UniProtKB/Swiss-Prot annotation:
Signal peptide per UniProt: none
Domain notes: Contains a C-terminal catalytic domain, and an N-terminal region which modulates catalytic activity.
Its EC number(s): 3.1.1.61, 3.5.1.44
Post-translational modification: Phosphorylated by CheA. Phosphorylation of the N-terminal regulatory domain activates the methylesterase activity.
HAMAP family, per database record: CheB_chemtxs
Primary localization class, coarse: cytoplasm
Keyword Cytoplasm: yes
Alphabetized Pfam families for the sequence: CheB_methylest, Response_reg
Species this protein is from: Rhodospirillum rubrum (strain ATCC 11170 / ATH 1.1.1 / DSM 467 / LMG 4362 / NCIMB 8255 / S1)
Listed name of the protein: Protein-glutamate methylesterase/protein-glutamine glutaminase 3
Locations listed in the record: Cytoplasm
Record GO biological process: chemotaxis
Top-level taxonomy: Bacteria, Pseudomonadati, Pseudomonadota, Alphaproteobacteria, Rhodospirillales
GO cellular component assignments: cytoplasm
Length: 370
């Protein structure tokens, strides 16, 4: 029996979430109206999973989450709106240690909650099995972002953008990630060195209203430029492209340039942006030896078979290890298929990519500088 603490100031929302879990079976549920009641329930009920609203009286969700992670860490699933403000706060919650989020329905709650019943059950069930990722803490991350932003603004002249690569020179790093991804990407991507010679394309399962906010957030954290991918955008060395949420993204070429192109969510793919579709498009567009695939934490198996094919054809792949994954679903499936050249903790992935790229820069540009 999984013990779930539902924290929400809306009596209707509490009731519907409780009914969904109890009707399905296998859940014991306690409810709380605000963060203060949640902290009391943390001690008396000792839940396996907490669903946590963001906007509540007396103590808001972020404050409550910080207290939970500081005193008695538990897997927390945030309940968030799809507004830009909701996206910003939810991403902050994920950075503080929440494992996932559920979209709070707009309009008629009773009708719209039923539409996301499967999502609620899947995410609460997965959260119960999740590893809690320790965050740096808000003040530490803000200092890190400030330092990186200053470094980006004061980058010396000899670290100017790399020359555009031709179709016969350029390669691409593809990163696929789902549950636990925002916090993991905030650990991995800032470690990529200035002057990284290949573009990086990231498919993070996320709503469309979240990805532009997430791209801006990562841009503040990273020495490389981070942008949300848009139609027919040329792939440039040292730029990180975030796939637009609720859609897919593919790689193709136009004239003498490779481009990244958002596409409507494909019906043959279960998750979006689809890691599988992204990797398959790269295999059609580029020689496999110029593809590096990285599969990070997440539920399911999106991207696992496609990245295994990259390895089979002579490309390189990295799977995040189980110990550092919030959910060892996607990377675990890659490992099961024998599709990972390396299995690494999140803390070592950027360093490995930098090492590979250092050799690439020496070959293409005649320099070994990283």
């Amino acid at each position: 029996m999984t013990k779930v603490l539902i924290v929400d100031d809306s009596a209707l929302m509490r009731r519907h979430l409780k009914e969904i879990l109890e009707v399905h079976g296998g859940f014991e549920v306690m409810v709380a109206r605000n963060g203060i009641e949640a902290l009391a329930g943390l001690e008396s009920f000792d839940p396996d999973v907490i669903t946590l609203d963001i906007n509540m009286p007396e103590m808001d969700g972020l404050t409550c989450l910080s207290r939970i992670m500081a005193t008695k860490p538990k897997p927390v699933v945030m309940v968030s709106s799809l507004t830009e403000t909701g996206a910003e706060v939810t991403l902050e919650a994920l950075a503080l240690g929440a494992v996932d989020f559920i979209h709070k329905p707009d309009g008629t709650i009773s009708l719209n909650v039923s539409r996301i019943e499967r999502e609620i059950l899947d995410k609460v069930t997965a959260a119960a099995k999740a590893r809690i990722r320790r965050s740096l803490g808000l003040s530490s991350r803000l200092r890190t972002a400030s330092d990186r932003g200053a470094a980006k603004r004061t980058r010396p002249a000899d670290s100017s953008p790399l020359p555009t690569l031709s179709l016969t020179e350029i390669g691409v790093v593809l990163i696929g990630v789902s549950t636990g991804g925002p916090g993991t990407l905030e650990e991995v991507l800032p470690g990529l060195s200035a002057g990284f010679p290949w573009p990086v394309v990231v498919a993070q399962h996320m709503p469309g209203s979240f990805t532009p906010v997430f791209a801006r957030r990562l841009n503040d954290l990273c020495p490389l430029t981070v942008i949300e991918a848009s139609a027919q955008m040329p792939l440039e060395p040292g730029v990180i492209y975030i796939a637009k949420g609720d859609a897919d993204v593919v790689i193709g070429h136009r004239a003498t340039r490779f481009v990244v192109n958002p596409m409507p969510a494909g019906p043959h793919y279960l998750w979006h942006p689809s890691v599988t579709r992204l990797v398959e498009s790269a295999l059609r567009a580029l020689p496999p030896e110029r593809i590096i695939g990285v599969l990070l934490t997440g539920m399911g198996d999106d991207g696992a078979e496609a990245m295994a094919e990259v390895k089979r054809r002579g490309g390189r792949t990295i799977a995040q290890d189980e110990a550092s994954s919030v959910i060892f679903g996607m990377p675990g499936e890659l490992v099961k298929r024998g599709g990972a050249n390396l299995v690494l903790p999140a803390s070592r992935i950027a360093g490995q990519l930098n090492a590979w790229m250092s050799r690439t820069k020496e070959t293409v540009y005649g320099t070994g500088q990283s």
